[in-house]
Curated annotation (Swiss-Prot):
Family membership: Belongs to the prokaryotic/mitochondrial release factor family.
NCBIfam families recorded: prfA (TIGR00019), PRK00591.1 (NF001859)
Function in brief: Peptide chain release factor 1 directs the termination of translation in response to the peptide chain termination codons UAG and UAA.
Organism: Cytophaga hutchinsonii (strain ATCC 33406 / DSM 1761 / CIP 103989 / NBRC 15051 / NCIMB 9469 / D465)
Gene: prfA
Main localisation: cytoplasm
GO molecular function, a single term: translation release factor activity, codon specific
Name the record gives this protein: Peptide chain release factor 1
Domain of life: Bacteria
Post-translational modification: Methylated by PrmC. Methylation increases the termination efficiency of RF1.
Length: 359
């Protein structure tokens, strides 16, 4: 492990020197990439410095024990060694987590898709509630959310809403949100006071660059139509809305949020690229046999992942059995607890897999 940490320290020193190079500073894309790598490596280098300090102190305490005759000094050295041994174990666990290979998509921006599922109007209303939950979380994280397309429900909320979210490590934070979110509550339209169960599906797709997915424009059919508002009424007399169909996969994407046809086309193409990437990525994982039976799920949008119980003010994530008894706070965007617990569960799984591979 020390050899690996030394190699990381050497790379960190190289990057630290490179970002001060005027030639690199003039290349903003290269500079941003190196700056990001610097921040990632710095986390490991700082912990490694603490680890080396603990190892040095352990050696010093052992040396005291080997030469010291005074019983009091020997006792102090023994106590120090016991404390340092615990610190060493703790920091080694932190280092192992930091050395887990990151999902290459973690740093990417995302396309967030939310759709009302079973439950009719109530499902659309809940889809709107889920959207606002993520909206508030984005506000707190300082991320930018941009609407791509939305179809409003007849009684509020959304039958479907698609947006882009950009910021630091967006996919890494929100990738576990993909799946079916179930709600149990008394709908506003319910006169008997009965609790109904509805659902909304969430898909979190990494936003990919043009280099990541090469799309043949001959495989894409482009249709234009007038933007429409609630109830299908026309809100734009120009054909600015765009519908793209990827003929080989049958994937259809539309965007009508912008007044400009060009901007709608660019947004729709961005979503299409991410969806094609998801299809190809899952196919690749299947071929390599890496789709493991994970405790935290496969990220499939059909997995039932979480239940929001309004009468009991309870939110339960079924993948890890984690429950929060403060539903209003969760719906206000306080989902950090779930995100952190899911991240820890993923790290524990990957550490276990790493141990099995090296056994």
């Amino acid at each position: 492990m020390v050899d690996k940490l030394e190699a990381i320290k050497s790379r960190f020193d190289e990057v630290a020197e490179a970002i001060l190079d005027p030639n690199i500073m003039s290349d903003m894309k290269r500079y941003a990439s190196l700056n990001k790598e610097y921040k990632e490596l710095n986390k490991i280098v700082e912990v490694y410095a603490q680890y080396k300090n603990i190892l040095d102190n352990i050696e010093s305490s052992k040396k005291v024990l080997s030469v010291e005759k005074d019983p009091d000094f020997r006792e102090m050295a023994k106590e120090e060694l016991e404390t340092l041994a615990v610190q060493k174990d703790d920091i080694e666990l932190v280092i192992k987590e930091l050395l887990i290979p990151k999902d290459p998509n973690d740093s990417k921006n995302i396309i967030l898709e939310i759709r009302g599922g079973t439950g009719g109007d109530e499902a659309s209303i809940f889809a709107g509630d889920i959207f606002r939950m993520y909206q508030r979380y984005c506000d707190r994280m300082g991320w930018k959310m941009e609407l791509i397309d939305a179809t409003e429900g007849t009684s509020g909320g959304y039958k479907e809403i698609i947006c882009g979210i950009s910021g630091e490590d967006v996919y890494g934070k929100l990738k576990f949100e993909s799946g079916v979110h179930r709600v149990q509550r008394v709908p506003a339209t319910e006169t008997q006071g009965r609790i109904h169960t509805s659902a909304a599906s969430v898909a979190v797709l990494p936003e990919v660059e043009e280099l990541d997915v090469q799309l043949n424009m001959n495989d894409i059919r482009k249709d234009t139509f007038c933007s429409s508002g609630p109830g299908g009424q026309s809100v734009n007399t120009t054909y600015s809305a765009i519908r793209l169909t990827h003929i080989p996969s049958g994937t259809v994407v539309q965007c009508q949020d912008e007044k400009s046809q060009i901007k709608n086309f660019e947004k729709a193409l961005k979503v299409l690229r991410s969806r094609i990437y998801e299809i190809e990525y899952k196919k690749q994982q299947d071929e390599l046999g890496k789709e493991r039976n994970s405790m935290i799920g496969s990220g499939d949008r059909s997995d039932k992942i979480r239940t929001y119980n309004y009468p009991q003010s309870r939110v339960t994530d079924h993948r890890i059995g984690h429950t929060v008894h403060n539903l209003p706070a969760v719906m206000d965007g306080n989902i950090d607890d779930f995100i952190e617990e899911l991240r820890l569960a993923e790290n524990a799984e990957r550490l276990k897999e790493g141990a099995q591979e090296t056994a």
